[in-house]
């Protein structure tokens, strides 16, 4: 008989929470709350924090002077990267905080399915998704919604023919639209007019 076994794990989310309680007195004193944790153990963690005192910056308190507090937690976790964001009760605002610095241009939420359709600027798409999809997976876990993400140009109406787009947006006739397409015009970028 081997007796009772004790299994220890360094991969749990609760370990991250407890380490922050040790390093950040404001968390231990419940002035700051860790509202959500998403973790890819050994690689990256995202935490969302909220303050009960408007005079305290919850992210700054968790990061510490010159990053000392978050670095101490990271060192305990084998140099795991830790992202700290401000909690928001609105899942869309929380997602925007979580994906920053990637710029979100649109969010459509379907409460019934629990899916958020998110559009980011094309140049931010790779940043928002992260290496091997890690960033968007952790963001989804942190927010508690399934996230479908795409760039702005991924959402162009693919059913609309180039000829029809020229006619509709530029105001040319069918004959000119056909000639433009024949001569290699294949993509139209439509932007709002600038005001001077």
What are these regions (language model features)?
Residues 1-187, 191, 195-196:
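RNA-contacting regions in translation and RNA-metabolism proteins
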């Amino acid at each position: 008989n081997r007796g009772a076994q004790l299994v220890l794990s360094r991969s749990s989310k609760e370990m991250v929470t407890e380490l922050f309680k040790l390093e950040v007195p404001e968390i231990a004193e419940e002035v700051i709350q860790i509202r959500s944790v998403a973790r890819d153990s050994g690689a990256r963690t995202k935490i969302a924090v909220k303050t009960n005192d408007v005079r305290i910056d919850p992210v700054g308190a968790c990061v510490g002077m010159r990053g000392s507090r978050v670095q101490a937690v990271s060192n305990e976790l084998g140099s795991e990267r830790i992202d700290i964001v401000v909690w928001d009760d609105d899942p869309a605002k929380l997602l925007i905080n979580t994906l920053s610095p990637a710029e979100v241009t649109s969010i459509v939420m379907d409460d019934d399915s629990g899916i958020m359709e998110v559009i980011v600027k094309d140049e931010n798409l790779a940043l928002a998704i992260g290496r091997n999809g890690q960033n968007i997976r952790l963001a989804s876990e942190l927010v508690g919604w399934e996230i479908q993400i795409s760039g702005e140009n991924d959402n162009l109406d693919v059913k609309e023919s180039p000829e029809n787009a020229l006619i509709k947006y530029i105001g040319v006739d069918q004959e000119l639209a056909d000639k433009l397409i024949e001569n290699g015009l294949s993509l139209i970028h439509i932007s709002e007019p600038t005001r001077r």
